[in-house]
Amino acid sequence: MSDSDTRKALNRAIGYLGIREHSRQEIRGKLKRNGFSDETIEKVLERLDTLNLLDDLSFARNFIRSRTRVKPSGLYKLRYELRQKGVPDDIAEEALREYDSAAQCLNAALKKMPFLKGDQEHRRKKLHTHLVNRGFDSQTIRQTLDELLTN
């Protein structure tokens, strides 16, 4: 491994981070797929840390904010997606502390409501399935459905 390899890997990583924020694990995987050695990757990750360019907590918070703005999701789904992105569980949990599951569930339900046809029971079942698929927990779903569909 040479300084040239480290410089190339660092430039590549900075390029990735210039496009969007990445988790530490995502950068590690991208560099590995590009053929860089584990030793080079670790040096690059350390350098990115010293430059404050790599922060899993910031990444997780921004991911949650972005994800829920476009497609409201529940805690289960967000936790799973953060794990897929390589964010450690303790950092994911810290980022999710600020998340308002009830508000997001209501938002997801309100977005879906105009597209539901049929009687109230049919709409309730469809909406329930939609919210489960979005990763919301059953208690939050029940509260949301009661709030929206109670006459």
UniProtKB/Swiss-Prot annotation:
It is found in: Cytoplasm. It holds the Pfam family RecX_HTH1. Keywords: Cytoplasm. It comes from the Bacteria. GO terms for cellular component: cytoplasm. One of its GO terms (biological process) is regulation of DNA repair. Modulates RecA activity. Belongs to the RecX family. This is Regulatory protein RecX. It comes from Prosthecochloris aestuarii (strain DSM 271 / SK 413). The lineage of its organism: Bacteria, Pseudomonadati, Chlorobiota, Chlorobiia, Chlorobiales. The gene is recX.
